């Protein structure tokens, strides 16, 4: 709880919660995290108490200065700890991600930003799994993909064609 308070005091107002440690403390830990973030009015995405909460709050839509964005968040793993129903941890899965991207587009957003928790630890370049899923996300509607987990900064790539500009930060 103190960590969440410190994050709030430091100025963070949005957190992604889908990562390989999402289930470390079981359902109780996941629910407690969500409740503490809600009590502090810190917006969050990636883990949910149940499907009705996910439907209500996902994708996270933000609008500022006339720019409307959708935030999506997924993880590659929960370290082998299964997610207990009714809790939800957004996993990297092309079927779910495509549905979420299409849902985000229904909100007439200017940009879709996908935050992924992926990649091998202590690697300075993206692995095959990251590349496959990152390219898939960009090809299927994500404008910006921001990865994390390797504990290293990995390359950032800018893509531009006649219609679009896209960015992928493999790991920050």
PLM region spans:
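Acidic, metal/ion-coordinating pockets
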Residues: 1-172
């Amino acid at each position: 709880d103190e960590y969440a308070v410190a994050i709030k005091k430091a100025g963070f107002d949005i957190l992604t919660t889908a990562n390989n440690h999402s289930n470390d403390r079981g359902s109780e830990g996941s629910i407690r995290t969500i409740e503490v973030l809600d009590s502090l009015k810190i917006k969050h995405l990636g883990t949910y108490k149940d499907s009705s909460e996910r439907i209500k709050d996902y994708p996270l839509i933000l609008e500022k200065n006339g720019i409307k964005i959708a935030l999506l968040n997924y993880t590659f793993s929960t370290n082998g700890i299964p997610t207990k129903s009714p809790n939800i941890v957004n996993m990297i899965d092309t079927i779910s991600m495509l549905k979420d991207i299409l849902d985000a587009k229904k909100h007439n957003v200017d940009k879709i930003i996908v935050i992924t928790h992926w990649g091998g630890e202590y690697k300075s370049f993206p692995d095959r799994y990251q590349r496959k899923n990152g390219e898939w996300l960009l090809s299927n509607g994500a404008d910006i993909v921001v990865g994390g987990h390797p504990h290293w900064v990995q390359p950032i790539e800018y893509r531009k064609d006649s219609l679009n500009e896209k960015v992928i930060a493999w790991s920050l």
